């Protein structure tokens, strides 16, 4: 015969008393190592009784009053388990607090050590950086002075180059003018030479013509004289 408690639990959708006990028993089995010896003996004794009664009930059947006894016993076991869990929680809290305290002390010590090391390292490198930056500033000042000197020299050289370009431009202009005058003079000279040559050629031609005429006249006179002489010799 099925008990009314079981019917009610199944209809309501809640876990049965046996399921609750089984879950509690499983949970307690996992945590046995952390409990004291007396608590384990109590739980094991009650668990054995419950298991024995469950076997009797499954083999021969149990009346509905047995369900109430089992329920009461399970409630007692649940109270013991809750006490054990509460004690375990308290011990765990104590261990946790002690561990946290120790960890915090270690962390504070490590943090302080690291902070001191960082501060020492920062001071050391800050001094080195400060020295380097000071040297850098001096080098920059020297570089700026050198740059200013170079710029002044460059300006002077640029001014000299500009003046030199002006002088060269003037000289080139003078050379150009002189060259133009030279070309013009050469052209005039060649023109004069051409005129002189033409005049000389004309004069030479005239002289040659006069000379030729003179030679011809002399030749004629000689021929006439020769003819006269020949005639005279023939006549006389």
Curated annotation (Swiss-Prot):
Where Phosphoserine occurs, the residues are: 36, 38, 59
User: Domain of life here?
Assistant: Eukaryota
Any one GO BP annotation for this protein: spermatid development
Query: What PTMs does it carry?
Result: Phosphorylated.
Q: Subcellular localization, per the record?
A: Nucleus; Chromosome; Chromosome, Centromere
Is this entry keyworded Cytoplasm?
Answer: no
Q: Where is this region: Disordered?
A: 1-40
Ranges spanned by the short sequence motif Nuclear localization signal, renumbered to the chain: 88-91
GO CC term, one of those recorded: lateral element
The family annotation for this protein states:
Belongs to the XLR/SYCP3 family.
Assembly and partners? Answer: Component of the lateral elements of synaptonemal complexes. Homotetramer; the tetrameric helix bundles assemble end to end into long homopolimeric fibers that exhibit a transversal striation with a periodicity of about 20 nm (in vitro). Interacts with SYCP2. Forms a complex with EWSR1, PRDM9, REC8 and SYCP1; complex formation is dependent of phosphorylated form of REC8 and requires PRDM9 bound to hotspot DNA; EWSR1 joins PRDM9 with the chromosomal axis through REC8.
What's the protein name?
Synaptonemal complex protein 3
Q: Which gene encodes it?
A: SYCP3
